[in-house]
């Protein structure tokens, strides 16, 4: 009798909704993880090395690979030529999909490794020393700025992309200090420009 009351009642009258979940698969679910990126295979397309993931999946699990690639086939027309299909793939590679990291690019060292030291006049008889080019030797500018401030007991700041300003005239001592602290910097790569106007 209780079951007939629930069946006849309005949905707004029921305080407890009886929802029966639909069972589409076996529980617990078995998730297939990629051997290249270690993510579930559905997420491989968002990684920067999609081609490697697809090759691994095609080699190890061809049936799963066929299911995943079926979603991409309807984009192409049935009467396409092979040359047209490859140009479409190239366009897809050029465009970065939202949410993906894209291809990781390596930095190219095109700038010559050279450190320049200059003495810049300020008001009256005061000077600042400008050191440029430490970043070309992969030296952290913030660490170098702290080191110069402690070594010379003065103020120092990182002002530009590759520039440190030290308050005071330290052009004579700074070459030896740089070579002492960072031995990868040789004497030929340090250039003293002398007194330069700002």
From Swiss-Prot:
GO terms of molecular function: mRNA binding; translation initiation factor activity
GO biological process: formation of translation preinitiation complex; translation reinitiation
UniProt-annotated stretches for the region Disordered: 76-110
Domain SUI1, residue spans: 115-182
Compositionally skewed regions (Polar residues) per UniProt: 77-87
CDD domains assigned: DENR_C (cd11607)
Function according to Swiss-Prot or TrEMBL: May be involved in the translation of target mRNAs by scanning and recognition of the initiation codon. Involved in translation initiation; promotes recruitment of aminoacetyled initiator tRNA to P site of 40S ribosomes. Can promote release of deacylated tRNA and mRNA from recycled 40S subunits following ABCE1-mediated dissociation of post-termination ribosomal complexes into subunits.
Compositional bias annotation for Basic residues: 95-110
Keywords per UniProt: Initiation factor, Protein biosynthesis
Gene3D superfamilies: SUI1-like domain (3.30.780.10)
Family: Belongs to the DENR family.
UniProt cross-references to InterPro entries, sorted A to Z: DENR/SUI1_TIF, DENR_C, DENR_eukaryotes, DENR_N, SUI1, SUI1_dom_sf
Protein name: Density-regulated protein
The species this protein was found in: Xenopus laevis
